[in-house]
Amino acid sequence: MSLLEQVSVSKKANIYFDGRVASRSVFFADGSKQTLGVVQPGEYEFSTSQGEIMEVISGRFEVLLPETTTWQEFSEGTQFELAANVSFKIRNTAIAEYCCSYL
């Protein structure tokens, strides 16, 4: 199991898509932030306001990255990077978890 140490965690979850996606913000002493999220089965579109690295913690996602037409699969232990101010889609058939690091 991977641990995040010496952090502060937001008590209130970020809830999206009528509760089908939920995440918690994690704050580090150096001022950086990550979010840890759980995604119920479905298809969702997200937008970024800053660069992100999305790491799949459990399960798998199919991802339609910006400016692409082919879905790519990312499973536990893999990651993908997103630029600022882009939109992307994810879909999954079972509950999956992610960790988002902001660039």
From Swiss-Prot:
The cysteines joined by S-S bonds are none
Which keywords belong to this entry?
Glycosyltransferase, Transferase
Q: What is the name attached to this protein's record?
A: Pyrimidine/purine nucleoside phosphorylase
Q: Which Pfam families match?
A: Ppnp
Matching PANTHER family:
PYRIMIDINE/PURINE NUCLEOSIDE PHOSPHORYLASE, PYRIMIDINE_PURINE NUCLEOSIDE PHOSPHORYLASE
SUPFAM superfamilies to which the protein is assigned, alphabetical: RmlC-like cupins
GO CC list: cytosol
Molecular function terms, GO-annotated: guanosine phosphorylase activity; purine-nucleoside phosphorylase activity; thymidine phosphorylase activity; uridine phosphorylase activity
Role according to the record: Catalyzes the phosphorolysis of diverse nucleosides, yielding D-ribose 1-phosphate and the respective free bases. Can use uridine, adenosine, guanosine, cytidine, thymidine, inosine and xanthosine as substrates. Also catalyzes the reverse reactions.
Per the record, the similarity remark reads:
Belongs to the nucleoside phosphorylase PpnP family.
| TM region positions | none
**Which organism does this sequence originate in?**
Shewanella baltica (strain OS155 / ATCC BAA-1091)
Entry EC number(s)? 2.4.2.1, 2.4.2.2
Q: Does the keyword Glycosyltransferase apply?
A: yes
Its UniProt entry gives the catalysed reaction(s) as: a purine D-ribonucleoside + phosphate = a purine nucleobase + alpha-D-ribose 1-phosphate; adenosine + phosphate = alpha-D-ribose 1-phosphate + adenine; cytidine + phosphate = cytosine + alpha-D-ribose 1-phosphate; guanosine + phosphate = alpha-D-ribose 1-phosphate + guanine
